[in-house]
Amino acid sequence: MSVSDIEQELQEIYGYRLSTSAISIITDKVNQQVLDWQNRPLEPVYCIVWMDGIVFKVRQGGKVVNKTIYLAVGLNREGYKEILGMWLGQNESAAFWQGVMTDLKARGVEDILVTVTDNLNGFTGAITNVFPMANTQICVVHQIRNSARYVVWKDKKEFAEDMKLIYNAPNRDMAKAELERFAQKWGHKYPYAVQSWQNNWEELTVFFDFPLEIRKIIYTTNLIENLNGKIRKYTKNKMVFPTDESLKKSVFLSLMQISKKWTP
């Protein structure tokens, strides 16, 4: 929100007047808090890091454009969640993700066991460059949604049930056998849907290396999607943000409220 927006809302909602200079002082403090938080030291090791983005509308050069706030949530060795940072971008690219990974490393992260993403463009190469021992798991739920886009309505239920046999298999070998049956059954009718499983197979099946009890939290980005939904609730009254800074402040304040419930 701009200073004038804040001034107007204070007057309309609370009947309280605050000078623009006072509001500016407060918002400047928030800017510093954002900077300090984004550059704070992190733990050396995270067991899992989930990454996803949430799109907002921002004014830029006299136009309204879509920009994405990318978030990283880590699970530390004590089993607690932590929002590691937020990064503003317009396009996913290897260079963008290289910058994000380098930022995490510069803040003290030495290793990540597993990263979970929605097959973000350029991500795998970037994390391999910075954290070569990390495993990258593509979110299976997103894979299911993307595959289903190719399927006509009358086939969707049966197609979904057959996909379920793949990721609910007890181990990777059984999952591979289910994939082969899936390909034989649907490959001619929906080749792109089947090929997307085959092409991403290694990154779709990392979760099989872990105990059954924790597989679901590894193969989905449900945790961070839930976080995104809560951010939407906090920011729903602002359809278009006037600047990048106002967007980052709003998301930061939302994250601070949400993460209070995560504190051990």
Regions found by a protein language model. Give the residues of each.
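RNase H-like nuclease fold core
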Residues: 16, 20, 25-116, 121, ...
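Amphipathic alpha-helical transducer elements in NTP-driven molecular machines
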Residues: 3, 20, 24, 48, ...
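Glycine- and acidic
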Residues: 11, 82-86, 233-234
